[in-house]
């Protein structure tokens, strides 16, 4: 846990999933402080919109103003709810919207934590363009190293005149005034042909590797299991290309597409609808934190390409949680398959959790691993 003192309230905040005590990661950053310093409680008029609030630092601080928290991360929503409870703040103080929803009209203040992907930022700025006015105060913040010329040019192109502040604690802010500059329409998704198939893959703004097949997925697809039955999971599904391939290779199986990103799940659904509509009745689409709340001993197989970062921080906490959830939800003799960068040494992590691990394939960058849930029902 970490403590954030600001001009609105003193907060105790924690990351979600929780980090280990040996190498704790903070649940807020200097950019959160810097953004809050710019606001005077008496100046806030109209709806307050907060975009990409990773662990709820801004939403908790401004809870008395009933803010809208907007983003593309269900884990961030869970983190914010947990931190509201931790600080004795009514959860209903914050209204949660995902990035594909319509934003509230005529906000008085918009606070933006600049996301990792420029495509998501552009989608969010275009959505804001439909609702902000020239009187809306628009402030964005990030680590100084994450604000580039392209970032500032995007604000200027979509919303209007843009300036940046001096760095403070290695954070920097962007101030923008809306003046409705001329702007051409842009498609909601990016599409490309999947090599070796007749499929067209559609990707919303925040989907990993949205402009083409990433090399890890390409390697994984060469080694996916065939002729499985029952329910199998594409965990952390992204655009669903792995799950789509599983549907094709396992015609007797049902595939559950799971991701914490609403845009990823929407992309997966779109890709099944457009490429294998006859398989829709063998699909389930789930926005979730890994397999939280899913009953034990449900699945015959789980497949995933686990992330090794959360927001801008490098961490294996999300992957570790995925592995534990997979073990709980697999049937006895159920199988977990993963692809990962070789340097992450997931072999020993999986062996620690499952008691076994086998290398299916490897190249100079990636490894495909398989582990089996053994033992009695427990």
Curated annotation (Swiss-Prot):
In the Enzyme Commission scheme, what number(s) does this protein have? 2.1.1.174
User: What EC class is this?
Assistant: transferase
Top-rank taxon of the source lineage equals: Bacteria
Reactions this protein catalyses: guanosine(1835) in 23S rRNA + S-adenosyl-L-methionine = N(2)-methylguanosine(1835) in 23S rRNA + S-adenosyl-L-homocysteine + H(+)
Q: Which residues cross the membrane?
A: none
The places in or outside the cell where this protein is found are: Cytoplasm
The record ties this protein, via CDD domains, to: AdoMet_MTases
**Cellular component, GO annotation:** cytoplasm
Under InterPro entries, the record lists: DNA_methylase_N6_adenine_CS, rRNA_m2G-MeTrfase_RlmG, RsmC/RlmG, SAM-dependent_MTases_sf, Small_mtfrase_dom
**Gene Ontology molecular functions:** 23S rRNA (guanine(1835)-N(2))-methyltransferase activity; nucleic acid binding
Keyword annotations = Cytoplasm, Methyltransferase, rRNA processing, S-adenosyl-L-methionine, Transferase
* Stored HAMAP family: 23SrRNA_methyltr_G
The record's section on PANTHER family has: RIBOSOMAL RNA LARGE SUBUNIT METHYLTRANSFERASE G, RIBOSOMAL RNA SMALL SUBUNIT METHYLTRANSFERASE C
Q: What does this protein do?
A: Specifically methylates the guanine in position 1835 (m2G1835) of 23S rRNA.
Q: Which NCBIfam families match?
A: PRK15001.1
Its family remark reads: Belongs to the methyltransferase superfamily. RlmG family.
Q: What is this protein called?
A: Ribosomal RNA large subunit methyltransferase G
Its lineage reads:
Bacteria, Pseudomonadati, Pseudomonadota, Gammaproteobacteria, Enterobacterales
């Amino acid at each position: 846990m970490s403590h954030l003192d600001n001009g609105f309230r003193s907060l105790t905040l924690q990351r979600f999933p929780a980090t280990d005590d040996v190498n704790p990661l903070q649940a807020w950053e200097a950019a959160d402080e810097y953004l809050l310093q710019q606001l005077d409680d008496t100046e806030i008029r109209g709806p307050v919109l907060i975009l990409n609030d990773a662990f709820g630092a801004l939403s908790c601080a401004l809870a008395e103003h009933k803010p809208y928290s907007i983003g593309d991360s269900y884990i961030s929503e869970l983190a914010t709810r947990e931190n509201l409870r931790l600080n004795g703040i009514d959860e209903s103080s914050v209204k949660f919207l995902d990035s594909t929803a319509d934003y509230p009209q005529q906000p008085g203040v918009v606070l933006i934590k600049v996301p990792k992907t420029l495509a998501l930022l552009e989608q969010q700025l275009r959505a804001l363009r439909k609702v902000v006015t020239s009187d809306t105060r628009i402030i964005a913040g990030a680590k100084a190293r994450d604000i580039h010329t392209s970032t500032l040019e995007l604000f200027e192109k979509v919303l209007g005149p843009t300036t940046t502040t001096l760095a403070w604690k290695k954070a920097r802010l962007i101030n923008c005034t809306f003046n409705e500059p001329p702007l051409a329409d842009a498609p909601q998704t990016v599409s490309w042909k999947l090599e070796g198939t007749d499929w067209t893959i559609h990707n919303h703004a925040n989907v990993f590797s949205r402009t083409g097949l990433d090399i890890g997925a390409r390697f994984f697809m060469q080694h996916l299991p065939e002729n499985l039955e029952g329910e199998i999971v594409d965990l952390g599904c992204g655009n669903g290309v792995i799950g789509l391939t599983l549907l094709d290779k396992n015609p007797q199986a049902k595939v559950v597409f799971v991701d914490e990103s609403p845009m990823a799940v929407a992309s997966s659904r779109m890709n099944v609808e457009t490429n294998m509509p006859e398989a829709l009745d063998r699909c389930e689409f789930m926005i979730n934190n890994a397999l939280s709340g899913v009953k034990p001993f449900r699945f015959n197989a789980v497949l995933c390409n686990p992330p090794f970062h959360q927001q801008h921080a490098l961490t294996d906490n999300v992957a570790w949680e995925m592995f534990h959830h997979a073990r709980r939800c697999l049937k006895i003799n159920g199988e977990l398959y993963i692809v990962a960068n070789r340097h992450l040494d997931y072999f020993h992590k999986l062996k620690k959790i499952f008691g076994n691990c086998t290398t299916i394939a490897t190249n100079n960058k990636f490894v495909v691993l398989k582990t089996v849930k053994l033992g009695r029902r427990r």
